[in-house]
Amino acid sequence: SISLNNSSYSFNDDLNESDIKRHIKYLSSDELEGRFPGTKGSELAIDYIASNFKNYKLAPFQDNSFLQFFDFSNLEDEKSRVANVIGLIPGNKNKDEFIVIGAHFDHLGYGGAHSGSLEIGSKEIHNGADDNASGVAGILELAHKLSLNRNLLNRSIVFVAFNAEEQGIFGSKYFINNSQIPKDKIITMINLDMIGRLRNLSLNVSG
């Protein structure tokens, strides 16, 4: 549950399991080739997330776009132009205060050397269902449900799908250093990472 306008709203009955599975299935499909930054698969993931933000009636975060572009160089010094995907639900009372909910959407592509894969001698698609299609599915579902209940929101909520996390949290660094939001106006940040499975029935929460 989450506190909204001095009341508690529970998502337990509203969460759509089929939508969550659909998001994970697409984002971790072979078509997206492991979502390595700067690749066609990464661009497909960006388009998918932005399209869902638009369908859920989120507002573009800056420059009338859901995309926040930045330059990325991988460990082999190959350069590309990549993007975070950002959507906004304006608050009603304290709209100049922000809660940020994020998850990285990139993964390891085909693996191999300099990818971060544990199997550096193998070149095959690393689908990344848990890491981190699961987290992206989480923010998409939260974006959908909170958008439907936007009249209950005191503060504004920013949803961010970060790019280039696996190679050194580049997307989140760029977001925080180039955001239109003053840092002292970010009340809290919730990051969803690898939420697709539980180990020993335990859930780790840190902050």
Short names for language-model regions:
Residues 4, 9, 14-44, 56, ...:
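N-terminal capping segment at the start of a domain
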Residues 15, 19-22, 26, 40-55, ...:
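Extracytoplasmic/secreted proteins, especially bacterial periplasmic and envelope-associated proteins
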Residues 87, 101, 105-107, 112-168:
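Alpha-helical metal-binding/catalytic segments enriched in His/Glu/Asp
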Residues 94, 162-207:
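Metal-dependent peptidase/peptidase-like ectodomains
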Residues 27, 53, 75-115:
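Acidic/His- and Gly-rich active-site-bordering loop/insert found
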Residues 25-28, 68, 84-88, 98-102, ...:
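Structural recognition of the beta-strand scaffold that forms the well-ordered cores
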Residues 7-14, 30-40, 71-75, 120-132, ...:
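Second-shell loop/turn segments in exported
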Residues 35-89:
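A non-catalytic alpha/beta surface segment that caps or lines the substrate-entry region
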